[in-house]
């Protein structure tokens, strides 16, 4: 047991009380630390805290199958040492591995098995550093600073803002004036006639019923204001020249 030298706290689990004190003293001398003693049949009733021992030595290991509890009782990197076992070592090693122990090995000459608890506490977790953190973009958040607005002043050019020059209006190719000749064939005569028919009069039309200003719902069938929006009484309304002429 020289390989256990320097371990501070050990647990010796026994099955045979004969020469028990001698075996405990041998373990204490080998480790140089404190040694607790527990019967293998009382192990399931014991109340040892987790990570209590650096070394657990158990004899006649086939008498217990509570290796998971032994794993919790050991400190990280603690050692489980079994000796005087009976039966094939392969099945016992497999059972120990399935309980969570690592580095399980057999010494056929000394008829012993040794295993270790991993270097971390049972149930512990660690953050993985290789995971890439993906930044989530909040697509529902719209910032006014990021939105490109169209400048209204850029929609119109300087030419669009200038008023049309009367001198640039269409004129007769014969007279050179905005007046159609007698036998006009360029279309100016029709254009001037269209402007004349759409010219509005400034005088108010006379109402016979007095309800013309209320809207079409209150106007008669021959009302010259049909189709026009309602207006205030006394308000001057301009009608096209052809609306004041009789159709007959």
Curated annotation (Swiss-Prot):
[2Fe-2S] cluster binds at residues 172, 181, 184, 186. Its cofactor is [2Fe-2S] cluster; [4Fe-4S] cluster. A motif (Cx2C motif 1) lies at residues 209-212. It comes from the Eukaryota. Keywords: 2Fe-2S, 4Fe-4S, Cytoplasm, Iron, Iron-sulfur, Metal-binding, Mitochondrion. Its main location: cytoplasm. InterPro entries: Anamorsin, Anamorsin_N_metazoan, CIAPIN1, SAM-dependent_MTases_sf. Residues 131-161 are annotated as: Linker. Residues 209-223 are annotated as: Fe-S binding site B. It is found in: Cytoplasm; Mitochondrion intermembrane space. GO terms for molecular function: 2 iron, 2 sulfur cluster binding; 4 iron, 4 sulfur cluster binding; electron transfer activity; metal ion binding. One of its GO terms (biological process) is iron-sulfur cluster assembly. GO terms for cellular component: mitochondrial intermembrane space. A motif (Cx2C motif 2) lies at residues 220-223. Residues 172-186 are annotated as: Fe-S binding site A. [4Fe-4S] cluster binds at residues 209, 212, 220, 223. Residues 4-130 are annotated as: N-terminal SAM-like domain. Component of the cytosolic iron-sulfur (Fe-S) protein assembly (CIA) machinery. Required for the maturation of extramitochondrial Fe-S proteins. Part of an electron transfer chain functioning in an early step of cytosolic Fe-S biogenesis, facilitating the de novo assembly of a [4Fe-4S] cluster on the cytosolic Fe-S scaffold complex. Electrons are transferred from NADPH via a FAD- and FMN-containing diflavin oxidoreductase. Monomer. The C-terminal domain binds 2 Fe-S clusters but is otherwise mostly in an intrinsically disordered conformation. The N-terminal domain has structural similarity with S-adenosyl-L-methionine-dependent methyltransferases, but does not bind S-adenosyl-L-methionine. It is required for correct assembly of the 2 Fe-S clusters. Belongs to the anamorsin family. This is Anamorsin homolog. It comes from Drosophila virilis (Fruit fly). The gene is CIAPIN1.
